[in-house]
Amino acid sequence: EQQRYLNAKKYVKLVLVADYIMYLKYGRSLTTLRTRMYDIVNIINLIFQRMNIHVALVGLEIWSNRDKIIVQSSADVTLDLFAKWRETDLLKRKSHDNAQLLTGINFNGPTAGLAYLSGICKPMYSAGIVQDHNKVHHLVAIAMAHEMGHNLGMDHDKDTCTCGARSCVMAGTLSCEPSYLFSDCSRRGHRAFLIKDMPQCILEKPLRTDVVSPPVCGNYFVEVGEECDCGSPATCRDTCCDAATCKLRQGAQCAEGLCCDQCRFKGAGTECRAAKDECDMADLCTGRSAECTDRFQRNGQPCQNNNGYCYNGTCPIMRDQCIALFGPNAAVSQDACFQFNLQGNHYGYCRKEQNTKIACEPQDVKCGRLYCFPSSPATKNPCNIHYSPNDEDKGMVLPGTKCADGKACSNGRCVDVT
């Protein structure tokens, strides 16, 4: 499974935000600024393609009236404010994997940008900020690719790191001879991060209707108006696709997809994806499409020897969640521990409404904070929780988890399984 994950194409669904100073800097022209932002993302996509990562612009926001955070010269303060705004505002409006702020402000010192290491897919940490430090857009694009590299688990290159050029993307300082290449160290760091964290959001391919940048034939994304996109005519190896037009060649039904074989749809009933577990189903081709639609067992079907119920293709049970948080010997705490969820304090609650924490009703206590017993010799406390103010949702009982016979958690309530 690990190898399958590593080999899979990755997609970063990006929202790019420009602050008010950027709007003023480009003459209050939304068209001029948008064009610059599109050009930057096209370069970033080109840079990451060598890593089997495609960057799709799914949102573009220009703060043309006023800034939505206080953008200041202290890069770490601005990053913290931008990341909090992304989590509490942007994510609620627009589904995406990563957000970058392009600012016209001068950061203190030699800093051209800042981002959280290994933050991708995390609500609070999948963010970066970049100064529009050069008129040449591809130099700004390299700086933004550098910050996204941090989000994807890459650290700064050391002197021993090589990429075959004078300077690599993850060099610690800006170079007058930058390249689009990642070093051997960056590749190792990224791979180690993928193995450790296995971020799931970057496996989801964006729909062509999600991409907001103008279609570019040759960027490996099938966008509105295109039937296929296999890269430039020089690099395309796809016999089904005409790289010059991004249209299917004569007689071809498809160019890619699990139900596409040698430019033709696979026959109806052909298995295209095996069932992963008891809550999944084997997926079959329809004979009319190249897509392999992911199907799973109905929600509420008993699983794991009746210890749980299927929920969106998974079988969430509390013990597995405790193991994920506290290690292989962890167990679910006794029922008395869950009474702390009646308090409605900063960690013991069932749900949040307008950022206010709502205490659990007595029948819902198993749908709030998860209480675990780590089972290590040093542990005396029978009621352990995972709580981080930066990611308050982590450590809550997952939706769909069995909370009583015939009942599962939904929005912090223990409701009948239907």
UniProtKB/Swiss-Prot annotation:
Pfam families: ADAM_CR, Disintegrin, Reprolysin. GO terms for biological process: apoptotic process; proteolysis. Zn(2+) binds at H146, H150, H156. A motif (D/ECD-tripeptide) lies at residues 278-280. Gene3D superfamilies: Collagenase (Catalytic Domain), Disintegrin domain. It is an enzyme of class 3 (hydrolase). Residues 10-206 form the Peptidase M12B domain. The active site is at E147. Ca(2+) 2 binds at D280, M281, D283, D294, R295. Expressed by the venom gland. Homodimer; disulfide-linked. This is Zinc metalloproteinase-disintegrin-like batroxstatin-2. It comes from Bothrops atrox (Barba amarilla).
